[in-house]
Amino acid sequence: MLREYKLVVVGGGGVGKSALTIQLIQSHFVDEYDPTIEDSYRKQCTIDDQQVLLDVLDTAGQEEYSAMREQYMRTGEGFLLVYSINSLNSFQELNSFYDQILRVKDSDNVPVLVVGNKCDLEMERQVSYEDGLALANSFNCPFLETSAKQRINVEEAFYGLVRNINQYNAKIAEAEKQQQQQQQQQNANQQGQDQYGQQKDNQQSQFNNQINNNNNTSAVNGGVSSDGIIDQNGNGGVSSGQANLPNQSQSQSQRQQQQQQQEPQQQSENQFSGQKQSSSKSKNGCCVIV
């Protein structure tokens, strides 16, 4: 399917808008002036090795058709701003036409091309080439001088506008691509931050669980009271109800061992005491049979 370009020809009355359009479409020059309200033309052509379809709208230049002209401007992709080199007034009108286009399109950058028509009327020139070029530069768009009568730069004007549209669309596409890449980068950065935050949360959760497990282990290894309740001190001992039981058993065993060690010593002391008493009685002349 052919790519279709909607081109709108804008300018004051009598500057040759219809003559340019008919010369492009029908390849002949219309000499008489017939004020146009609106005419639409279509032509298939080849631009930069591509088959395209040009839909050219020739608009009325009179001020009374300004509201109607705005409707055409809304549908246009690119605009030829046409003045006549032998009419200073038509040249000065282009500023208001350009402002109207920007207002209707709600943009400060629209594909346009400034055309100084009737360059064959050099002897009647009121607008210099330099002035036309300066105006185009202020609009940031290309500039051509044309002659519909002599078919000078007619195709170049319309084809140049198509190229301008393509460049404009390419810039828009590139800007959208960069914006999409920036959005993807922002999403990736946000996702990375979310993952980092999740990892920190997981690490904190693992740390808290480890602390809780250590506390539980310390409590289990602590003492148990007589009622089976874990000692809150967590010191590994038992409560006072049973804390002294091993110590008491140990003391009793030690006393038994000491008593057993003391019995032979006591017997030896008793024997020694008996011998002393026997010796004493023998000295006193008494004899005791034991």
Swiss-Prot record:
Residues 178-216, 246-283 have a biased composition (Low complexity). A lipid is attached at C287 (S-farnesyl cysteine). Residues 288-290 form a propeptide. A motif (Effector region) lies at residues 33-41. Signal peptide: none annotated. It is a lipid-anchor. Coiled coil: none annotated. Keywords: Cell membrane, GTP-binding, Lipoprotein, Membrane, Methylation, Nucleotide-binding, Palmitate, Prenylation. The modification Cysteine methyl ester is found at C287. GO terms for cellular component: cell cortex of cell tip; cortical dynamic polarity patch; division septum; mating projection actin fusion focus; plasma membrane. PROSITE patterns: RAS. GO terms for molecular function: CTP binding; GDP binding; GTP binding; GTPase activity; UTP binding. The lineage of its organism: Eukaryota, Fungi, Dikarya, Ascomycota, Saccharomycotina. Required for the regulation of both a MAP kinase signaling pathway and a cAMP signaling pathway. The activation of these pathways contributes to the pathogenicity of the cells through the induction of the morphological transition from the yeast to the polarized filamentous form. This is Ras-like protein 1. The keyword Oxidoreductase does not apply. GO terms for biological process: cAMP-mediated signaling; cell adhesion involved in single-species biofilm formation; cell-abiotic substrate adhesion; cellular response to farnesol; cellular response to glucose stimulus; cellular response to heat; cellular response to oxidative stress; conjugation with cellular fusion. Belongs to the small GTPase superfamily. Ras family. A lipid is attached at C286 (S-palmitoyl cysteine). It comes from Candida albicans (strain SC5314 / ATCC MYA-2876) (Yeast).
